[in-house]
Amino acid sequence: LGAEAVQIGTRFCVAAECICHENYKQKIIKAKDIDSEVTGRSNGHPIRCLRNQMSREYLRLEKEGAGFEELERLTVGSLRNAVIDGDVKNGTVMAGQIAGLIKKEQSCKEIVEEIMEQAEKLMHC
């Protein structure tokens, strides 16, 4: 058994080359390990995001039994609002659990090199 792939989107969101708004990057960099939550479980479209006004409202509506259409209306355009416009309070800030461990912006080259160095160390243990 072994890993065949990894999903590292959150790490690359804060890469120097990434076009994500600086507010989005900083929200991830400042995140703690307990700052993410999963929304969308009730409608079969779960996503992990960082807590903010949008996610709290979404979870409240979900808990109250809101339907797919109502939840969809709330979130239409919200990812763009966060990623492109930088509205990290009312937009959806998608990020994995790893967000709490990301503490700085790096180039893609630095990220890949760091991952490879860590993998090599682990494989030689």
Please annotate each region the language model reported:
Residues 1-125:
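Conserved active-site-proximal phosphate/metal-binding subdomains
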